């Protein structure tokens, strides 16, 4: 074989090795023509800036080549604790060139994200009492870890009604990445916030509350908005000196997404404890994000009888269970209401995590392990290869 042919084979192999992956994820909820692009870890900030300039030139050239009117392809860029990525809408030629770029790790389609709850009706309030007692027989709430003084709660959801009376003036509007309605017109975000930090219904009764709206009035958003929300929260916490003193509740889900998982983990590494919903599909949590990220605290849903809720996702990625059914909490316009789902379980973990972090001085990435140490092994029939640990706030009761 000639040296020339050997060189051709070598460069062909090298091209295959260096080409990024276009991840083949569950097609449900995919937004046509929209992508998330993640850079390799070794890429410097200067190289990332250079890549973005290259992307803009490439996008413009490929549109002109096909006589397509110019549209701004790039929609967002992110740097979350060194995790560099961007999103946008690009044609097939541009996507192929992105995949071939030496600094790109992978590309995946942008997808819808939505709330992870099931709305129910009833007249029961029991979650706070259950997580503050070892035995399932009490009806009061006990806490020896304080009330969340000096903790800030970031709610990434459908927004939060910051004027809700149960928030006692502690809530502020952060950013709206969903629409032009600067309030919670869905109710999901205000409900989860009430369990985390409401005066009557919550755990962090003295924490500051920040609303980050990424879902519309129907409870829908997408991965780009989600990562934009994470990025905004990290920057806000950094500017205000709140890293290491903040918690975040994510009662949302999309199909398994490497980009969502990586961004969520990096946000926690930056200094915010994160609790995420396992999901309500009665299957393994591994199929959904961010619940499939092993480094964050993934929460399954339990019933009043300390069994796994029938719809709760399960599996080795679930870290612990928390109350989920008929949870009464805050709604917009000073109303209250009952909801059920892993969306309602997760805020309990977020709240107790904030108490533990503040009182014991733990780093965010250590909080979930501590919660698992405190938890009670009381969940019956938790599912295949799933923990039986139920959230407990360590009150001694």
Curated annotation (Swiss-Prot):
Residues 35-115 form the Inhibitor I9 domain. It is found in: Secreted. The keyword Hydrolase applies. Its EC number is 3.4.21.-. Residues 20-116 form a propeptide. GO terms for biological process: proteolysis. GO terms for molecular function: serine-type endopeptidase activity. Residues 1-19 form the signal peptide. The keyword Repeat does not apply. One of its GO terms (cellular component) is extracellular region. Pfam families: Inhibitor_I9, Peptidase_S8. Its main location: secreted. Residues 125-397 form the Peptidase S8 domain. The active site is at 157 (charge relay system), 188 (charge relay system), 343 (charge relay system). Keywords: Glycoprotein, Hydrolase, Protease, Secreted, Serine protease, Signal, Virulence, Zymogen. CDD domains: Peptidases_S8_PCSK9_ProteinaseK_like. Glycans are attached at residues 123, 136, 150, 249, 305, 334, 385, 393. Secreted subtilisin-like serine protease with keratinolytic activity that contributes to pathogenicity. Belongs to the peptidase S8 family. This is Subtilisin-like protease 12. The gene is SUB12.
């Amino acid at each position: 074989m000639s040296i020339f042919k050997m060189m051709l084979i070598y460069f062909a192999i090298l091209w295959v090795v260096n080409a990024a992956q276009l991840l083949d994820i569950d097609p449900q909820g995919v937004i046509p023509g929209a992508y998330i692009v993640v850079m390799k870890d070794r890429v410097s900030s200067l190289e990332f800036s250079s890549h973005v300039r290259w992307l803009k030139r490439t996008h413009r050239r490929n549109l002109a080549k096909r006589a397509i009117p110019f549209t701004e392809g790039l929609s967002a860029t992110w740097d979350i604790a060194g995790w560099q990525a961007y999103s946008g809408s690009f044609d097939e030629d541009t996507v192929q060139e992105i995949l071939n770029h030496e600094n790109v790790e992978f590309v995946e389609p942008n997808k819808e994200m939505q709330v992870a709850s099931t709305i129910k009706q009833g007249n029961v309030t029991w979650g706070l009492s259950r997580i503050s007692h070892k035995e399932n027989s009490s009806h009061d709430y006990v806490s020896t870890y304080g009330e969340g003084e000096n903790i800030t709660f970031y709610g990434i959801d459908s927004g939060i009604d910051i004027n809700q009376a149960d928030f006692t003036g502690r809530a502020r509007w952060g950013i709206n990445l969903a629409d032009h309605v600067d309030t919670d017109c869905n109710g999901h975000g205000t409900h989860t916030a009430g369990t985390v930090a409401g005066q009557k219904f919550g755990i962090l009764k003295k924490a500051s509350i920040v609303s980050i709206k990424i879902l519309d009035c129907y409870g829908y958003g997408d991965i780009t908005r989600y990562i934009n929300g994470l990025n905004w929260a990290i920057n806000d916490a950094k500017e205000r000196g709140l890293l290491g003193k903040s918690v975040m509740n994510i009662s949302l889900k999309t199909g398994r997404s490497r980009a969502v998982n990586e961004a969520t983990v990096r946000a926690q590494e930056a200094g915010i404890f994160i609790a995420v919903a396992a999901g309500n599909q009665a299957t393994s949590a591994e199929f959904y994000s961010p619940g499939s990220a092993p480094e964050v605290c993934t929460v399954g849903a339990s019933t009043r009888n300390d069994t796994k809720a029938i719809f709760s996702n399960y599996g080795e990625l679930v870290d612990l269970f928390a109350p989920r059914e008929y949870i009464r909490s805050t709604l917009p316009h000073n109303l209250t209401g009952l909801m059920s789902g892993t969306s309602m379980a997760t805020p309990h973990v977020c709240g107790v995590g904030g108490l533990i972090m503040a009182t014991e001085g733990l780093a965010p990435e250590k909080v979930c392990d501590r919660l698992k140490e405190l938890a009670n092994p009381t969940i019956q029939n938790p599912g295949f290869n799933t923990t039986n640990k139920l959230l407990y706030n360590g009150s001694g009761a």
